[in-house]
Amino acid sequence: MQAFFLACMLPAFLFGKGEVVYTRLQALYSNNAGGWNIEKVVLSDTATVVSFSVRAKPYSWIQMASSTYLSDEKAVEYPVRKAVGLTLDEKFYMPKSGKTEFQLIFAPMPKDTKIFDMIEGDGRDMACWYGLHDAKSKVKMPVAREEVDAEEVGENMFRTGKAVVRGKIEGYKPGWGYGIVAVTDNTLGSRPESSSSALIRPDGTFCLDWPLEHPVWDELKPGCGPDIPVYVRPGDTLDLVIKAKGDGIETVEYTSSHPKGCYEKLLKCKVPEVYAEWERKGEIWKTLTDEEFWAMTKETMETGNRLCDYFVWKYGLSPWEAHLLKARQQVAVVINQTVLANWMLSSRYGYYPPNEELRKDFYEGNDYSLYKVLNEMPTDDPSMSFIPYFRAMVSRMKDMQPMTDAWSLASMGDVDWSDVEGQRLMDSLQVEALRGVMGVKEIPYLVQAYLVNKVCDLPDFLTPEGRKKIVEYRAACLTNPYLKRKIWKLASDYAQPLPATTKLEGKALEILQPIVDKYKGKYVQIEWMKPRKSGVD
């Protein structure tokens, strides 16, 4: 009865001759869409109507945002015009039955559209359907061709330099983005204080200096609101024209000083990372078998890669852009699955025996085959450093079971793990464990990066000479020129203590207190300027 009533409420002009009706809708991937089912899509000359059925807990609420839009095969967007059965941006409380139906009416998509997306918005919890198509249409999606751009990963790209990101926010209003934009330093061994930021001027412009060591595909982050994807290299100048819409962003246009540009098509691909979402299934690591682990990993990888193939086809990405897109997806899955492997093996092996005589037997001969999941990402590709997740991947490798077991083995016997020889033994055991798991003879880029990043965690009580010996040993394992330079830079940086913090008092507090009071609750960037010809800072 409700479905009939809603159909009667729809304007008669929506259903005319020549309309195209899709049922049996399938999606390549959906997110935050549990309990929501797209029953029918009608394409006509005047509108596109999407009919939903929803199942949820009785008296709970659902919501659909007015930012919802459809995106067709050519990435043209069609905004929602109205809803029937609920009000956009308002909570709809489910009836006692836990079932409801409603329709969304969009601007008309071409009637020959065979596959499309429906996106509620950029919010983390907003519903998204990618690659919607009628099951009968048999949409064929080619596997994307991948290729590493030799020029982009050339040695001259791995150099210290500054990128400049300039922006103009059209429709800027004070308070947009909290008046600040920032970027996170995701290079190996980076510290939080090395991030860069810039204030947005009253006219909506900003200029951010970004120290780099290689190209990066990352995000410019306003103080609030959606992030802005960017691709920059050392020495690049990237100009952005950002069209604001309320507190959000409607469009971003890019202009790069580099002859190859900034891969604007790639930046406009809003591809979500696909995860197995095992965290939502309780403590499954206690009973999960290896076979189930690999089946989960395979399914997640296939779904993620298939989604990337779709976006490569939809946006016409180059083989190099396709490689970056898929690599980001693969790194994200590998990070997530190695955490699951950690939990599984920790649950299986438990705690080490209290009797030291039994510990060596406890740590030797363990099955680390779950960590072959590392091979699901490009392990010997320097362009992995361009992806922000790579630093997280390398940092978390120290928590892998073979890494912690190697640390324990190195601490046994007459060798002191905290001394130079103990550190060398631990490095050797860890590298051999990784090579064994990955089935490689050489030391791939991923493992070399892990050795470099470990410099950040050298014990504080080591003497300068001891630190130097350990770094020399690790540097001898490296073949990548950038990583060879990087390990010595990190060794120098981390040999220095962190900057001390000083309580504001006296004249400094007197100067800053009015600023703190005026901008309370907002980000404030303060620059201390040294007067010319003055010895006082």
Question: Could you describe each region identified by the protein language model?
Answer:
Residues K17-V143:
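Conserved functional micro-motifs across diverse proteins
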Residues A244-V536:
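Oxidative protein folding and maturation machinery
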